Protein backbone atom coordinates (compact mmCIF):
# COMPACT_ATOMS: atom_id res chain seq x y z
CA UNK A 1 0.00 0.00 0.00
CA UNK A 2 1.32 3.44 -0.91
CA UNK A 3 1.61 5.60 2.20
CA UNK A 4 3.52 8.57 0.74
CA UNK A 5 1.87 10.66 -1.97
CA UNK A 6 0.49 14.05 -2.95
CA UNK A 7 -3.31 14.33 -2.89
CA UNK A 8 -4.26 16.99 -5.42
CA UNK A 9 -7.28 18.79 -6.79
CA UNK A 10 -7.33 21.62 -9.31
CA UNK A 11 -9.95 24.08 -10.47
CA UNK A 12 -9.83 25.37 -14.03
CA UNK A 13 -11.52 27.74 -16.47
CA UNK A 14 -12.79 24.79 -18.53
CA UNK A 15 -12.15 21.19 -19.54
CA UNK A 16 -9.39 21.44 -22.16
CA UNK A 17 -5.78 21.70 -20.87
CA UNK A 18 -4.57 23.06 -24.22
CA UNK A 19 -7.09 25.91 -24.22
CA UNK A 20 -8.24 26.48 -20.64
CA UNK A 21 -6.20 27.52 -17.60
CA UNK A 22 -5.63 26.56 -14.00
CA UNK A 23 -7.41 28.73 -11.43
CA UNK A 24 -6.48 26.94 -8.22
CA UNK A 25 -4.23 24.15 -7.00
CA UNK A 26 -4.91 22.46 -3.68
CA UNK A 27 -2.69 19.65 -2.43
CA UNK A 28 -1.68 17.74 0.67
CA UNK A 29 1.62 15.93 1.17
CA UNK A 30 0.84 12.60 2.80
CA UNK A 31 3.78 10.84 4.46
CA UNK A 32 3.36 7.52 6.22
CA UNK A 33 -0.41 7.90 5.79
CA UNK A 34 -0.62 11.28 7.55
CA UNK A 35 -1.03 14.82 6.24
CA UNK A 36 2.34 16.49 6.76
CA UNK A 37 1.84 19.72 4.82
CA UNK A 38 -0.70 21.39 2.56
CA UNK A 39 -0.40 23.68 -0.44
CA UNK A 40 -3.06 25.97 -1.89
CA UNK A 41 -2.88 28.85 -4.30
CA UNK A 42 -5.10 30.69 -6.70
CA UNK A 43 -3.53 31.26 -10.10
CA UNK A 44 -3.87 34.37 -12.22
CA UNK A 45 -3.21 33.22 -15.77
CA UNK A 46 -4.68 36.44 -17.16
CA UNK A 47 -7.98 34.81 -18.16
CA UNK A 48 -11.29 35.91 -16.65
CA UNK A 49 -13.22 33.32 -14.66
CA UNK A 50 -16.26 32.23 -16.70
CA UNK A 51 -19.57 32.78 -14.90
CA UNK A 52 -20.36 29.05 -15.06
CA UNK A 53 -17.06 28.21 -13.37
CA UNK A 54 -17.81 30.71 -10.58
CA UNK A 55 -21.19 28.98 -10.12
CA UNK A 56 -19.51 25.55 -9.93
CA UNK A 57 -16.45 26.40 -7.84
CA UNK A 58 -17.15 29.68 -6.07
CA UNK A 59 -13.92 31.10 -7.53
CA UNK A 60 -14.32 34.73 -8.58
CA UNK A 61 -12.18 37.08 -10.64
CA UNK A 62 -11.17 38.83 -7.41
CA UNK A 63 -9.83 35.53 -6.07
CA UNK A 64 -8.00 34.85 -9.34
CA UNK A 65 -6.46 38.33 -9.28
CA UNK A 66 -5.19 37.70 -5.74
CA UNK A 67 -3.39 34.59 -6.99
CA UNK A 68 0.13 33.94 -8.15
CA UNK A 69 1.24 34.07 -11.75
CA UNK A 70 1.77 30.61 -13.32
CA UNK A 71 5.52 31.25 -13.57
CA UNK A 72 5.61 31.37 -9.76
CA UNK A 73 2.86 28.89 -8.85
CA UNK A 74 3.89 25.96 -11.05
CA UNK A 75 7.56 25.68 -9.97
CA UNK A 76 6.43 26.17 -6.37
CA UNK A 77 3.90 23.34 -6.69
CA UNK A 78 6.43 21.03 -8.37
CA UNK A 79 8.86 21.66 -5.51
CA UNK A 80 6.08 20.87 -3.01
CA UNK A 81 5.47 17.54 -4.80
CA UNK A 82 9.07 16.41 -4.96
CA UNK A 83 9.12 12.96 -6.55
CA UNK A 84 6.01 11.66 -4.80
CA UNK A 85 3.19 10.06 -6.79
CA UNK A 86 -0.01 12.03 -7.32
CA UNK A 87 -3.40 10.85 -6.05
CA UNK A 88 -6.72 12.35 -7.04
CA UNK A 89 -10.31 11.67 -8.02
CA UNK A 90 -10.42 11.52 -11.82
CA UNK A 91 -6.75 12.46 -11.58
CA UNK A 92 -6.19 12.39 -15.34
CA UNK A 93 -8.08 15.70 -15.48
CA UNK A 94 -5.86 17.32 -12.83
CA UNK A 95 -2.72 15.70 -14.23
CA UNK A 96 -3.44 16.97 -17.75
CA UNK A 97 -3.73 20.57 -16.57
CA UNK A 98 -0.69 20.35 -14.29
CA UNK A 99 1.43 18.77 -17.02
CA UNK A 100 0.36 21.40 -19.59
CA UNK A 101 1.08 24.22 -17.13
CA UNK A 102 4.54 22.75 -16.46
CA UNK A 103 5.28 22.42 -20.19
CA UNK A 104 4.18 26.05 -20.67
CA UNK A 105 6.90 26.99 -18.16
CA UNK A 106 9.54 24.81 -19.85
CA UNK A 107 9.28 22.27 -17.00
CA UNK A 108 8.33 18.60 -16.85
CA UNK A 109 5.71 16.88 -14.74
CA UNK A 110 6.11 13.12 -15.09
CA UNK A 111 5.18 10.82 -12.23
CA UNK A 112 2.98 7.97 -11.15
CA UNK A 113 -0.69 8.88 -10.72
CA UNK A 114 -3.29 7.04 -8.64
CA UNK A 115 -6.93 7.61 -9.52
CA UNK A 116 -9.51 7.08 -6.76
CA UNK A 117 -12.30 7.11 -9.37
CA UNK A 118 -10.75 4.17 -11.26
CA UNK A 119 -10.13 2.34 -7.99
CA UNK A 120 -13.75 2.89 -6.92
CA UNK A 121 -15.07 1.63 -10.27
CA UNK A 122 -13.06 -1.56 -9.83
CA UNK A 123 -13.74 -2.17 -6.14
CA UNK A 124 -17.33 -0.90 -5.94
CA UNK A 125 -18.98 -1.87 -9.24
CA UNK A 126 -22.47 -1.96 -7.70
CA UNK A 127 -22.32 1.48 -6.10
CA UNK A 128 -24.80 3.72 -7.98
CA UNK A 129 -22.45 6.73 -7.96
CA UNK A 130 -18.71 7.07 -7.56
CA UNK A 131 -18.61 10.84 -7.24
CA UNK A 132 -16.24 11.94 -4.50
CA UNK A 133 -19.01 13.14 -2.11
CA UNK A 134 -20.82 9.82 -2.57
CA UNK A 135 -17.66 7.82 -1.86
CA UNK A 136 -17.01 9.91 1.25
CA UNK A 137 -20.55 9.15 2.44
CA UNK A 138 -20.13 5.44 1.64
CA UNK A 139 -16.89 5.24 3.64
CA UNK A 140 -18.17 7.66 6.31
CA UNK A 141 -15.31 10.08 5.69
CA UNK A 142 -15.70 13.81 6.28
CA UNK A 143 -14.92 15.41 2.90
CA UNK A 144 -13.98 18.70 4.55
CA UNK A 145 -13.85 21.43 1.92
CA UNK A 146 -13.35 19.10 -1.02
Task: Annotate the PLM regions.
Residues 1-111, 125-145:
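Conserved non-catalytic scaffold segment of RNase H-like nuclease domains
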Residues 111-121:
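A short, structured active-site edge motif that brings together acidic residues
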Amino acid sequence: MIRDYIAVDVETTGLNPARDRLLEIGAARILNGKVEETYQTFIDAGVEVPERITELTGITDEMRLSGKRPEQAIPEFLEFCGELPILGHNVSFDFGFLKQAAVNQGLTFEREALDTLKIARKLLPDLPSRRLPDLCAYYQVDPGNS
